Amino acid sequence: KNSLTIDVASQSASFGGRLLNLGPRHYELLYLLVTNKGEVLSKQALMKKVFPENDESDTRFVEVYIDKLREELNENLDNPKIILNEGTTGYKIVGSHTIVRRALKETEGL
């Protein structure tokens, strides 16, 4: 079963053991969804947190970034199973998630 792991120390995430290719804002968006698991986060609230320099009523940024996160999670964009739309107002995340507060183990040098 695929589970999502968020590594707070390195600001990275992996899904099913595969490191996700996320920029800082993608990570922040994913972190907000995971730390509010099961709760609907409005597009405006996500705009305010992740894109504070933009008008929070212009939610296209959030929509584009959510689509990129879904692609990284190998989601079917027409029928997502992990990051769910809640009407037209927001998103919530479901499934198995782990938050790690220490860095992922690095391979030791020789």
What are the roles of these predicted feature ranges?
Residues 1-27, 92-110:
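A structural micro-motif at secondary-structure boundaries
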Residues 12-87:
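Positively charged, aromatic-enriched patches within helix-turn-helix-type DNA-binding elements
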